[in-house]
């Protein structure tokens, strides 16, 4: 089975943005961030996306069975900001048994639920430079 089929079958909960505020005349860019641990890095990564000047950014947060502090932070961002979607996995999807398929599940679930015509992914410990989008 390929990673797309695995993603469709995986056990997750999708929470669409509470408030959507997109410019109808501009493309939506979705940035997917999957998170498990490293709250300090997660905060920097997420903030670098929220600080972009381009307003049609959908932030797709993936709680990959995250540690409690990371999970709480992601939920707070989801509730507080416009254009933020949240995907919650009950348990971490990573496995050394099949790294390529397991890692791709989170990313593909994000892609399957995204609104953007342009879709990107960054790791929890990466940051976007100013005006990247």
Predicted regions and their residues:
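Acidic donor-binding/catalytic loop of UDP-sugar-dependent glycosyltransferases
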Residues: 68-69, 126-133
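N-proximal low-complexity "stem/linker" segments adjacent to membrane-targeting elements
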Residues: 1-48
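Glycine-rich, basic loop-to-helix element that forms the pyrophosphate-binding segment
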Residues: 90-114
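Short, acidic, metal-binding catalytic loop of nucleotide-sugar glycosyltransferases
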Residues: 47-56
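A conserved acidic beta->alpha catalytic loop
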Residues: 63-73, 91-93, 123
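Short, conserved active-site loop motifs that form the nucleotide-linked donor/cofactor pocket
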Residues: 57, 82-85
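Short aromatic/hydrophobic "clamp" motif used to bind/position activated sugar donors
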Residues: 119
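Hydrophobic/aromatic residues located in beta-strands of well-ordered beta-sheets
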Residues: 59-61
């Amino acid at each position: 089975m390929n990673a797309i089929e695995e993603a469709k079958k995986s056990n997750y909960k999708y929470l669409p943005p509470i408030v959507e505020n997109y410019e109808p005349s501009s493309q939506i860019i979705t940035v997917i961030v999957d998170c498990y641990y490293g709250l300090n890095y997660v905060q920097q990564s997420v903030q670098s996306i929220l600080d972009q000047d381009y307003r049609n950014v959908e932030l797709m947060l993936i709680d990959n069975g995250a540690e409690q502090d990371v999970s709480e932070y992601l939920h707070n961002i989801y509730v507080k900001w416009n254009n933020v979607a949240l995907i919650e996995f009950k348990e971490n999807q990573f496995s050394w048994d099949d790294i390529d398929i397991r890692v791709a599940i989170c990313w593909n679930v994000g892609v399957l639920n995204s609104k953007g015509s342009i879709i990107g992914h960054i790791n929890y410990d990466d940051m976007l430079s100013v005006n990247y989008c």
